[in-house]
């Protein structure tokens, strides 16, 4: 009788290993590599430009024993590599296959959920490493190494600080700086918002654009106490259920509804995907959380329909939805983020999850269930009211719920009521409300809205949204105040340098085009070498490692002598200086934006439009004493 071959599965994390082990039992041993085992070296560039961008890989410090263990497992028996199904995971699998001399074998398994049905199917159908996906990931890694290893030392040398520059992070920083510049330039216009209230309903004056009325007109409008129904149109309006979550929409909704940062959302989602201990063993609660897709498997749809029928009735089950046109930026055919078992209700899950895990799971569970339900239906009444002489008109809309559909699960706020009047009928009394308001600029980004914009523009990927924003915050390039993101002095000065010298690196369109190129490498339409050559030719033509960044900007700050102060950078960091010799230090994280060569410190309140700059009058301090006699240092 032949000896039974031992079987091993390699995953990234212990939690994932434990969940898979609880499914497969003693049939397989499951080992965690703890993420990447090999990468470009930290101590040197690690890319041979003379050999067509050949990478020089090295075992990550502290992972030597992991590599030896993997080699040992490959010698002992059959080794299956089950790292994540995205590009990063494919690259990890490739490195593992290389060090274990198993490249070319069908030893790669992928899955979007860690459930018995899917895991058992995956181990039956191993495939070879997807080298197109690996090349796309290696190209991204080398591109980022070229940019980071070239530009970061320039920033270190000039600012004596652990700063960095990169393709995605710099393009994202540009979005925040550009928005602050828009707010700075915005000139508010006053206008009147005029409404009439009657029978608990509201209608707004009908004008082509927001306008400011003169006093005589306002007095005339204020005297209106009766209107006539000129037009009434009734129709049935359906509201389609939301799609199940993908990475970006989960991050946005968790930020909006739960107040979670995008990093916190991804950390908790990872825990729910990899598994949590329950009475039935280690169980995964959601599918893979880094995805561009809203696709749902037929199996999951059927499970959802069964639950909806059981709990709410067959009339709530959504029809087979027509597959929507796929987004050109979607990286591959992942599934949406959904519960692995829709019958695991949030109440039941709460027995095993901590508070934050339960909140996020409930959000995912409700969104998925709602996505498989019928649209909600309302009776929509659009009406027009006019004064008897026809001089002024007011328009309004009111909704009356007919069928709640998906809103049974996914609550939505709508303006509901009834319009009991008919055309020609008089509406009396009416109360006129006149409010003087100002136009407002676009709001500053929150973490959620920044992710939405990054996705819309094609900057980064689901796996990089959270880490990019976290990096910008950690570097001090941006600052979060009451949930809104502001550029700082250091962020604005670095961005000004990058925009002037490396406009392509920070260009949103260039960064998005580069992501498209990487997609084409993965699809086999382009080679990684061509993408790298094209980028390097452009980048190397402007790169100068000896660049000196001169910080000398006029500011919006006045000295006590009345003259404008300038921003400079010296031995002790950023500071303001005046011709009269007075100086004042400023913190790296003070809010600032550069516009037309001038740096504006403080912030402009987007609600009121009033400046919030801080005066520097009479602020002699320690840094002034340090710099005495060192003007212009």
Curated annotation (Swiss-Prot):
**Cofactor(s) needed for function:** Mg(2+)
Specify where the region named Interaction with DNA lies, as residue ranges. Answer: 164-169
Q: Where does Mg(2+) bind?
A: 12, 84
Q: Which InterPro entries match?
A: Topo_IA, Topo_IA_2, Topo_IA_AS, Topo_IA_cen, Topo_IA_cen_sub1, Topo_IA_cen_sub2, Topo_IA_cen_sub3, Topo_IA_core_domain
Q: Name one GO biological process term.
A: DNA topological change
Zinc as a keyword?
yes
Q: Which domain of life is it from?
A: Bacteria
The reaction(s) annotated as catalysed by this protein in its Swiss-Prot or TrEMBL entry are:
ATP-independent breakage of single-stranded DNA, followed by passage and rejoining
Q: Which GO terms describe its molecular function?
A: DNA binding; DNA topoisomerase type I (single strand cut, ATP-independent) activity; RNA topoisomerase activity; zinc ion binding
Residue spans annotated as Zn fingers (C4-type) read 559-580
The identity of this protein, by name, is: DNA topoisomerase 1
Organism field: Thermotoga maritima (strain ATCC 43589 / DSM 3109 / JCM 10099 / NBRC 100826 / MSB8)
Instruction: Print the organism lineage.
Output: Bacteria, Thermotogati, Thermotogota, Thermotogae, Thermotogales
């Amino acid at each position: 009788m032949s000896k039974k071959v031992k079987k091993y599965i390699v995953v990234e994390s212990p939690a994932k290993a434990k969940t898979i082990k609880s499914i497969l039992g003693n049939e397989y041993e499951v080992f965690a590599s703890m993420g990447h085992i090999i990468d470009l070296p930290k101590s040197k560039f690690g890319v041979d430009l003379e050999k067509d961008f050949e990478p020089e890989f090295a075992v990550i410090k502290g992972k030597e024993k992991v590599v030896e263990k993997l080699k040992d497992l490959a010698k002992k028996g059959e080794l299956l590599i089950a790292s994540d199904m995205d590009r990063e995971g494919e690259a990890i699998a490739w490195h593992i296959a290389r060090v274990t001399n198993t490249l070319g074998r069908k030893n790669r398994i992928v899955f979007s959920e860690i459930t018995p049905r899917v895991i058992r199917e995956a181990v039956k159908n191993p495939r070879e490493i997807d080298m197109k996906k690996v090349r796309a990931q290696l190209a991204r890694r080398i591109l980022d190494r070229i940019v980071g290893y070239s530009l970061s030392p320039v920033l270190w040398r000039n600012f004596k600080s652990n700063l960095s520059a990169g393709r995605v992070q710099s393009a994202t920083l540009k979005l925040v700086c550009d928005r602050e510049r828009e707010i700075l330039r915005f000139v508010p216009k006053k206008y009147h918002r005029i409404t009439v209230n009657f029978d608990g309903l509201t209608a707004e004056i009908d004008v082509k654009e927001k306008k400011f009325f003169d006093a005589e007109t306002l007095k005339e409008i204020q005297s209106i106490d009766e209107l006539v129904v000129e037009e009434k149109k009734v129709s049935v309006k359906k509201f389609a259920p939301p799609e199940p979550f993908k990475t970006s929409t989960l991050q946005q909704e968790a930020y909006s509804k739960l107040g979670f940062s995008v990093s916190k959302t991804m950390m908790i989602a990872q825990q729910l995907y990899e598994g949590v201990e329950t009475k039935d063993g280690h169980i995964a609660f959601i599918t893979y959380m880094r995805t561009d897709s809203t696709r749902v498997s037929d199996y999951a749809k059927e499970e959802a329909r069964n639950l909806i029928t059981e709990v709410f009735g067959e009339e709530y089950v959504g029809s087979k939805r027509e597959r929507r046109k796929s987004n050109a930026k979607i990286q591959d055919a992942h599934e949406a983020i959904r519960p692995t078992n829709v019958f695991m209700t949030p109440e039941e899950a709460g027995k095993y999850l901590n508070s934050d895990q339960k909140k996020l799971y409930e959000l995912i569970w409700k969104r998925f269930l709602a996505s498989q339900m019928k649209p909600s239906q309302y009776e929509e009444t659009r009406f027009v009211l006019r004064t008897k002489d026809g001089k002024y008109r007011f328009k309004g809309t009111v909704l009356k719920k007919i069928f709640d559909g998906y809103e049974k699960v996914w609550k939505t706020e709508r303006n509901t009521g009834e319009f009991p009047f008919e055309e020609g009928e008089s509406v009396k009394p009416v109360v006129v409300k006149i409010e003087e308001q100002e136009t407002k600029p676009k709001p500053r980004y929150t973490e959620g809205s920044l992710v939405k914009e990054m996705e819309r523009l094609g900057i980064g990927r689901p796996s990089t949204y959270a880490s990019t924003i976290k990096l910008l915050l950690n570097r001090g390039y941006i600052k979060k105040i009451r949930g809104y993101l502001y550029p700082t002095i250091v962020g604005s000065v670095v961005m000004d340098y990058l925009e002037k010298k490396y406009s392509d690196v920070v260009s949103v369109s260039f960064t998005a085009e580069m992501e498209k190129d990487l997609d084409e490498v993965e699809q086999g339409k382009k080679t990684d070498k061509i993408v790298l050559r094209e980028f390097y030719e452009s980048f190397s033509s402007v790169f100068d490692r000896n660049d000196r960044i001169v910080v000398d900007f006029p500011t919006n700050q006045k000295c006590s002598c009345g003259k404008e102060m300038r921003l400079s950078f010296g031995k002790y960091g950023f500071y303001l200086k005046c011709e009269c010799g007075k100086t004042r230090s400023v913190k790296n994280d003070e809010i600032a934006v550069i516009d037309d060569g001038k740096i504006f410190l403080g912030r402009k309140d987007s609600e009121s439009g009033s400046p919030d700059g801080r005066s520097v009058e009479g602020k002699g301090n320690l840094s002034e004493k340090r710099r005495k006699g060192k003007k212009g240092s």
